[in-house]
Amino acid sequence: STAPVNDRDDLSMAYTPGVARVCTAIENDPSLSHKYTIRKNTVAIVSNGTAVLGLGDIGPEGAMPVMEGKALLFKEFGGVNGFPICINARTADEVVDFVQRIAPTFGGINLEDIKAPECFEIEERLRASLDIPVFHDDQHGTAVVTLAALWNSLKITGKKMEDLTVVIAGVGAAGVAIGKILLNAGIGDVIGCDRVGAIYTGRGEMNSAKEWFAANTNSSRKMGTISDVMKGADVFVGVSGPDLITAADVRSMAKNPIVFAMANPNPEIRPEQVDGLASVMATGRSDYPNQINNVLAFPGIFRGALDANATDITEGMKLAAAIAIAESVSDAELSPDFVVPSVFNRTIVERVAPAVAAAAVRDGVIRKS
């Protein structure tokens, strides 16, 4: 406990009759719940277990160890109390209804391991209906760290954001979010690929998320396979599956290519296959250099959002987090094998949280009391 209960006076303050004064104050001004209750530092980690790591749809019971691990990371790196909640809910309506009902207990909602395309609808509806931050980490945590790594990679290659063509393999939760944040950062063009091939306007076999992606990317309407659209591209970002591309594909890219092969546990191409071909290579694995890991993002993002008493997590807050993560790598440290900081760098949250909080103020999403 954070408050001692050693005598009758302590008990009367912690519970009845003293607690009634706090209850009445919150009844009259519900925003005070973010000041006087656990809401001020507690995030629900909600999953239905339909898209767990590389394991797939393993159900809520199977997902629980991942959510427990997430709670540990929230506390260890961000000082945030994360509460794992795995629910037996298959549809978007069920998940949205559940989260709306438990929202009064929490200061934020971290959605986790919910399959696409339902994850897009769930997050969108919850953001619209709740006055606390809602963040699908599989989408935005990955996107934020990817952008941070790309910014630092450009310092090495000398390329400019607005001149880049980026190919994204995998247009699911992470792929769509990466595309969005890259566009918001001023990227030249993005081309997404799924199992059918390149995403472009007018193509068939697309859900609503891919329809959005098609309408906002691939301005030249390139068609064909992943190998076709990689020709002349500056950056490859993989969030799909193992062994998807070859050394020949990387060789066909523009000069000084950047390759982020982030499929886990086995990347789209292994670093040893592009040694001497790629200027910068990153994966999602801890046993290779440049691990693009969400733990670099979500503790600081929620720490900043809670500290600011924010009601949402905006695109500006995500961009601020990406910049702060990128700047955690000093000029002296920056190298092709070190474009993202170590997850054990304890200064990252100290940089990310205030940057996110300041962005929340700029974007006007601070709770008014």
Descriptions of predicted regions:
Residues 1-132, 353, 359, 363-367:
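N-terminal ligand-binding/catalytic initiation module
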Residues 137-138, 157, 163, 261-368:
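Adenosine-phosphate binding glycine-rich loop
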Residues 34-39, 75-76, 101-103, 127-128, ...:
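Solvent-exposed alpha-helices and their adjacent loops that cap or buttress functional pockets
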Residues 211-280, 285-287:
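Rossmann-like adenosine-cofactor binding region
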Residues 84, 110-113, 134-137, 168, ...:
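General beta-strand structural signal in soluble alpha/beta enzymes
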Residues 53, 58-78, 130, 136, ...:
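Glycine-rich phosphate/diphosphate-binding loop of Rossmann-like nucleotide-binding domains
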Residues 48-50, 58, 87-88, 113-116, ...:
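Short, ordered loop/turn segments at secondary-structure junctions
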